[in-house]
């Protein structure tokens, strides 16, 4: 689900760069060879708020492993993505399951993200064609809106919109749509911070637009790029107690 976090740091402004080229540079900034993240997933379902903590290791766009550390109900839950497959291990059942088919559309641990969102980590410039929108930004003064159209009819979100600060060249908001054009997800990117050569959002707020009064906030407490990751983290053998 880390394709939500794209930003770009460079010279010039968005209008001077073709939309597709800008998207390629966004990808270049996002996709380090490897990443490690420690974060908090704060889930507000409109009635109560609960916080999950997790560590995640990512290699390129095809492999990732997440280990949930708290609260007690989710402690020990693990998720492993390799290519186009996603497995989940829960200590309560002491077994792993392959998340596929209709299961991918279900809410991930009660959050505003689906398991399909977890599978959306790919380079946007590879999966989408980009154009600049003529729509004016009412939410963010001076922002430019990028329209993204999926190249493959099987892509989960056929269209997206991204609000970009043309000076800092960072993403402020993203919207994701169904094939019908119905708005499904909205994401806000906040608390940008310089990490190495990257400008990265420390906070992201997700909203499932098919639900009422819910939101899921992801707080990144630790972010490290280009680290060495043991091979065992991307093996199914890690999906056990």
Where are the regions that the model predicts?
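Gly/Pro-enriched, hydrophobic low-complexity segments
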Residues: 95-99, 119, 141-236
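Short, conserved active-site entrance elements at the starts or edges of catalytic domains
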Residues: 111-149
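Solvent-exposed coil/turn segments that connect beta secondary-structure elements
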Residues: 42, 59-61, 69-71, 84, ...
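N-terminal mature ectodomain segment of secretory-pathway/periplasmic proteins
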Residues: 17-92
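Sec/Tat signal peptide C-region and signal peptidase I cleavage site
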Residues: 10-15
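Bacterial N-terminal signal peptides
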Residues: 1-7
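Short structured motifs
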Residues: 21-24, 51-53, 128-134, 187-190, ...
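Acidic/charged, solvent-exposed loop-and-adjacent secondary-structure segments enriched in E/D, K/R, S/T
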Residues: 90-120
């Amino acid at each position: 689900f880390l394709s939500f976090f794209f930003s770009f740091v460079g010279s010039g402004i968005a209008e001077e760069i073709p939309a597709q080229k800008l998207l390629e540079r966004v990808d270049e900034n996002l996709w380090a060879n490897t990443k490690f993240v420690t974060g908090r997933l704060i889930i507000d379902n409109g009635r109560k708020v609960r916080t999950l903590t997790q560590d995640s290791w990512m290699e390129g766009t095809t492999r990732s492993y997440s280990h949930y550390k708290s609260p007690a109900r989710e402690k020990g839950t693990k998720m492993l993505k390799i290519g186009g497959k996603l497995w989940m291990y829960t200590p309560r059942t002491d077994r792993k399951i392959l998340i596929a088919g209709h299961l991918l559309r279900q809410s991930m641990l009660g959050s505003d993200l689906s398991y399909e969102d977890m599978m959306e980590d790919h380079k946007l410039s590879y999966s989408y064609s980009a154009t600049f929108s003529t729509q004016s930004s009412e939410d963010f003064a001076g922002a430019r809106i990028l329209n993204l159209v999926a190249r493959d009819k099987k892509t989960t979100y056929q269209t997206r919109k991204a609000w970009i600060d043309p000076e800092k060249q960072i993403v402020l908001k993203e919207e994701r749509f169904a094939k019908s054009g119905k708005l499904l997800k909205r994401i806000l990117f906040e608390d940008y911070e310089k990490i190495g050569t990257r400008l990265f959002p420390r906070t992201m707020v997700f909203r499932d637009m098919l639900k009422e009064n819910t939101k899921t906030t992801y707080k990144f407490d630790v972010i490290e790029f280009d680290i060495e990751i043991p091979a065992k983290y991307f093996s199914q053998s890690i999906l056990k107690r």
